[in-house]
Amino acid sequence: MSCYKVMPIAKNIDDELYELNKLLSEKEEFQLDREYQKEILEKERKFLEDLKTANEVFDKRTLMTLFSLLAGKHLTEYIGIVNSGKEAVVFKARKGKFYRAVKVYRVATCDFKTMSKYIQGDPRFHLRKSSRRQIIHAWVEKEFRNLRRASEIINAPKARLRRENVLVMDFVGYRGIPAPKLKDMQDLDWEKYFKIIKESMKKLYEEGELVHGDLSEYNILVKDDEPVFIDFSQSVITQHPLAHPLLIRDCINICNFFRRKRVDCNYKDLYKYITGKEIDPIDEAMIKQL
């Protein structure tokens, strides 16, 4: 099974920079003029120093991908870490005056077995082999497509580009400050928010033919007094064999949260509102297998 070789950042950052940029310079599209090369070098150095400070380690291929986004002028600079989890790290970056979120999947710690389960049931993808590289690239491509589709229908960040295990999307926040999660909000009009969220779930299902798959108060941000759905990595199309079990779980999560806010909510009613159908007991039983 092919796999990326995880290489820690060198103690001498200059050596690391030299090696990575030497590899980049071998590619024709990254033949940069001297001044821009110098500018990029300083940004790369700061990025590596920030990674070292945060005890973040990426394999060489991932660093090459991140640096190529600077060299190719897809991004202006990386600013800092927004969120760090077991399977992915989200960075804040800029593209000119616009902020971007850069999601980097950790090659060494991703749950490839779970990823395969979600990808293989999606008719948009046909994995003939199951190498780690193919799986993670398909996973990023799937999230990219899901975001593109969702952002046309509901409040969700627009995906800008994807490259290997890296996904670039719009940053949800205020002047570079991340928007708060729904779980951290106080004194909102909870009835209003529940109504907007259930309408968004319905539109996503009917118009986008998508099920979020991991929807909860943790994956909904609040910006301009509106909910914004994020993290579409587990989202599936409605034809996927796990679509309805995942939708039931989403309905349970949302109703559990809003009931704590004293909003009258029943997950079976929410599911019927979204799909127009009663819950199939077989689908509900499958939740335990997710």
From Swiss-Prot:
Record: active site? 214, 231
Supply the EC number(s). Answer: 2.7.11.1, 3.6.1.-
Q: Which reaction does it catalyse?
A: L-seryl-[protein] + ATP = O-phospho-L-seryl-[protein] + ADP + H(+); L-threonyl-[protein] + ATP = O-phospho-L-threonyl-[protein] + ADP + H(+); ATP + H2O = ADP + phosphate + H(+)
All copies of the Protein kinase domain together span 76-290
**Binding positions for ATP?**
82-90, 103
**Entry coiled-coil feature ranges:** none
Residue ranges spanning the membrane: these are: none
> Which positions in this protein are listed as binding Mg(2+)?
219, 231
* GO molecular function terms noted in the UniProt entry: ATP binding; hydrolase activity; metal ion binding; protein serine kinase activity; protein serine/threonine kinase activity
Pfam families, alphabetized: RIO1 (PF01163)
Per UniProt, the keywords (alphabetical) are: ATP-binding, Hydrolase, Kinase, Magnesium, Metal-binding, Nucleotide-binding, Serine/threonine-protein kinase, Transferase
Homology family? Belongs to the protein kinase superfamily. RIO-type Ser/Thr kinase family.
Q: What does this protein do?
A: Despite the protein kinase domain is proposed to act predominantly as an ATPase.
Protein known as: RIO-type serine/threonine-protein kinase Rio1
Organism in which the protein naturally occurs: Methanocaldococcus jannaschii (strain ATCC 43067 / DSM 2661 / JAL-1 / JCM 10045 / NBRC 100440) (Methanococcus jannaschii)
Gene name of the record: rio1
